[in-house]
Design a protein with these regions (language model features):
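Core catalytic lobe of class I
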Residues: 1-316
């Protein structure tokens, strides 16, 4: 199987040609429902109802599950949509806001049980549908943006986050927690010492141990060993990552840091990362920078050209 390649094809058809249990990780962000029209036959996101949209994505990701290794991980970025009247809405897809990246769509955006102006709940509808299709739903990560796209709404808070779901094929899977661990603040380290200085003999703040005499006897009086104090903690599920503009396309892309975090945690070094909605190639760029291989699938030939320009060529 060739890697470090970009496949210009419908994602479902392309996935069907890849071997079973061959890919370590998927990091992707499919087109959001009823926000943009990219002028492509078979494009996802232009369905008449959310139910049809979700059904198509479940079919794509069902095929993804086949090619994913048993220990593989699937990181899915998805945002929500409001029910509307069919007029062009003011909300802009943060990944593709203007120009060459499609036109605003005029879809009624009706959903069973939803009224006009209701938030549809696309992320959770999709997550539950994927769980019903056999995926393990392991985490709902909030991607919080300090620089979100502005909205003109005056009767609700402006949106500044999206979901990143971690799903897996099996109960046991590759996950490198240490690779994305967060540093502990100095104030937290001080709490571990109970306010004592680093040369204190005892600490009552080592979790689960009560008063513990220092194992390090380098000084005759003994002192508290800083090696007992953790310097990192398990990464939390709110990630503060700004969007990053891409000057070549005049739009904000899926941030490299977001893709890199998913890849570091979910794909071993030298492994293969796939993105069936490759867009301008951020997942491939991140995979390459981290010593992983990539496979990108993209329906739009213009995006394929953008991705190749960003990544700097392909193998094979």
């Amino acid at each position: 199987m060739k890697t470090d390649v970009i496949i210009n094809r419908d994602c479902l058809m392309a996935l069907r040609e890849l071997p079973t249990d061959s890919v370590h990780c998927c990091v992707t962000s499919p087109p959001y429902y009823a926000l943009r029209d990219y002028g492509m036959d078979a494009q996802i996101g232009r369905e008449d109802t959310p139910e049809e949209y979700i059904k198509r994505l479940v079919a794509v990701f069902h095929e993804l599950k086949r090619i994913l290794r048993p220990d593989g991980t699937f990181w899915l970025n998805i945002a929500d949509t409001y029910c509307g009247t069919g007029s062009k809405g003011s909300y802009t897809d943060p990944k593709n806001p203007k120009g060459r990246n499609g036109q605003s769509v005029s879809i009624a955006r009706t959903a069973a049980g939803c009224k006009q102006k209701d938030l549809i709940g696309i992320p959770w509808l999709l997550a539950f549908a994927l769980r019903a299709d056999g995926w393990y739903l392991r985490s709902d990560i909030i991607w919080c943006k300090a620089n979100p796209m502005p909205e003109s709404c005056k009767d609700r808070p402006s949106r500044c986050y999206e979901h990143v779901f971690l799903l897996t094929k099996s109960k046991q899977y590759f996950y490198d927690a240490a690779a994305i661990a967060e540093p502990i603040a100095p104030t937290s380290a001080a709490r571990y010492r109970g306010g004592r200085s680093a040369n204190s003999k005892y600490s009552s703040e080592v979790p689960g141990q009560g008063k513990v005499q220092n194992i390090n006897k380098a000084r005759s009086g003994g002192y508290y060993d800083d090696a007992l104090i953790p310097t990192t903690r398990n990464k939390r599920d709110v990630w503060h990552i700004n969007t990053v503009p891409y000057k070549g396309g005049h739009f904000a892309t899926f941030p490299p840091k977001l893709a890199e975090t998913c890849i570091l945690a979910g794909c071993p070094k030298g492994g293969i990362v796939i993105d069936p909605f490759f867009g301008s190639g951020t997942t491939g760029l991140a995979a390459q920078a981290l010593g992983r291989c990539y496979i990108g699938i993209e329906l739009n030939v213009d995006y394929c050209a953008l991705a190749r320009a960003r990544i700097g060529g392909e193998k094979g």
